[in-house]
Amino acid sequence: MLGAFGQADILINNAGITQPLKLMEIGRGQYDAVLDVSLRGTLLLSQAFIPHMRDRKSGSIACASSVSAQRGGGIFGGPHYSAAKAGILGLAKAMARELGPDGIRVNCVTPGLIGTDITGGKLTEAMKTEISAGIPLGRIGTAGDVAGAFLFLASDLSAYITGAVIDVNGGMLIH
């Protein structure tokens, strides 16, 4: 990446997988798969970019977590998904504290239910209506809603923000 573009100003850790399993259905392989992609992936990719950002004394790392981490479950993810996404919150806050003196900001975005190719085929119109009724803004989020939060974190508008969590859930979870 650096060879092609010369520098990295922002890293967005946005990998994740989910499995709709109950607690007692989760096997080691399933647990490892979800945590490896979400949590270990966030750590390893960050470690790959941090030396470059430290050399430049500048950078922004934005990590995708989930409302599932904050409320202890979601519509599609199992407990291991919630745990992985909660781990990202803790990791990002620890990274913000450690990397701040190096001029590197680290923040999280916690999307709620977002209409994507993953969720699109799993929700009937009746389900969408029922879920939307419980969201104060009255709709399921879009990829653009989430992208806006990441764009903000990539910009100078967030130059004095680190260790923060931006909820993008239409009010699905208010705390």
Language model features: what each stretch is:
Residues 66:
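Residue(s) in the substrate-gating loop at a strand-loop-helix junction
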Residues 1-6:
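Conserved amphipathic alpha-helix within the SDR
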Residues 46, 84, 92:
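Active-site helix of classical SDR
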Residues 135-146, 157:
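A conserved structural motif in NAD(P)-dependent oxidoreductases
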Residues 22-23, 30-35, 131:
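Substrate-binding pocket helix/loop in short-chain dehydrogenase/reductase
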Residues 51, 93, 97-101, 159:
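Alpha-helical segment proximal to the catalytic Tyr-Lys
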Residues 150-151, 162-175:
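Short C-terminal tail/terminal secondary-structure segment
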